[in-house]
Amino acid sequence: MDFQLTEEQQLIRNLTREIARKYIAPRAAEIDVEEQYPEDVFQVYREAGLLGLTIPKAYGGSNEGGGFLSLALAVEEVAKYCCASGLMLLLTALPTQPIVLGGTEEQKETYLPPIAKGEMKAAYGLTEPNAGSDAAAIQARAVKKNGSYVINGEKAFISGGSVADYVTIFAKTNPAARSRGISGFIVPKTSPGFSVARLDEKMGVRGVPTALLAFQDCTVPEENLLGGRENEGFKTVLGTLNSVRPIVAARGLGLAQGAMSYALSFAEKREAFGGPIANLQAIQFMFADMVIQIEAARLLTYQAAWLVDQGCFQKQHSHMLSVAKAFATETAVKVSSDALQVLGAQGYMRDHPLERHYRDARQLMIVEGTSQIHRVIISRALLDRDLVYP
């Protein structure tokens, strides 16, 4: 069992660590307060070549087989300081993976290189106002008409939806067939009938806008049907969500490390009861528990990303991706809460980053499958004997 990173992965981690410390850490609080997409951070990513880590090399990216672990490493480093900046990197994979998995050759050649080069941004549209965890219940409708598809419906809570040049969405082409009647579409922002209906006000992760997208007789050409085939989108939905779950886990892993490191530095300096509070066993045990959770989350996250890189992201391996996502994101919430507790009243104040880490962490247990949905996936794998213990 080899736990060594490749030379390229080590370079990516070191590069991203330097970028995070130099550019992102000083901007993190400001990004949260301004609630504006940090274009300067995006340009830093672009210049560093970090926008195509999961996009195959044949389409302008740098992925030759280890891209998801590379992206997880990069996101982990960034999320130590700013979870929103980590989400920006995730959004190079989430909207493009459906095209990688199910797109035509023409779609791959058209829509993947601009993301890898930083010439475009993209978003992913699955969730609707009345369809979240039950993805098969989406109500957006696409009807073929005169060589085009006319789309009607809404997509809710879409990360980066207001800054995206195109959105990869899913809609019903055969409503009676439920999940077997779902198709994917690539919708450029210039499409007639497409609009950003609302920007949401959020508790955390404020640097990446979240939008309600409206499709009112939105017309896209027939060649924008993902894969050129109707009613085959749901398999792509599942493959995409499974693929990016280790990246969400990496956001949690990085956030937890950042929160713990800040609290530890504080505890070593804060004097109480005759010395630094880091000398108190009660505080030491809190940090020991943080380390246990973080190191377990690290192994699960890296393993999950490695599985995706091996092509193991379909049903028989989905439970391991769910284990990683659920554990790492819940670790982020627990560790950020305990780190805030170490600071006491100071941790509750905006003078310190821990209140932001805590707000940001809470998002992670919801996106790309709630913690409860992941427990459903894991328990089903156990009952179906996909997950077998001797």
Positions of predicted regions on the chain:
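A short, Trp-centered hydrophobic/proline-enriched beta-strand micro-motif
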Residues: 118-126
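A short core secondary-structure module
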Residues: 147-148, 152-196
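Alpha-helical interface subdomain recognition
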Residues: 1-85, 102-107, 114-118, 134, ...
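Short Ser/Thr-interspersed hydrophobic loop/turn segments at strand-loop and sheet-helix junctions
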Residues: 49, 75-79, 171, 187-192, ...
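Long, acidic (Asp/Glu-rich), low-complexity accessory segments flanking structured domains
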Residues: 216-235
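Helix-loop "lid/cap" segments that line or gate small-molecule binding pockets
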Residues: 93-102
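Short Gly/Pro-enriched turn/cap motifs at secondary-structure boundaries
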Residues: 90, 115, 130-133, 157-160, ...
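Flexible, small-/acidic-enriched active-site or ligand-binding loops
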Residues: 137, 190-221
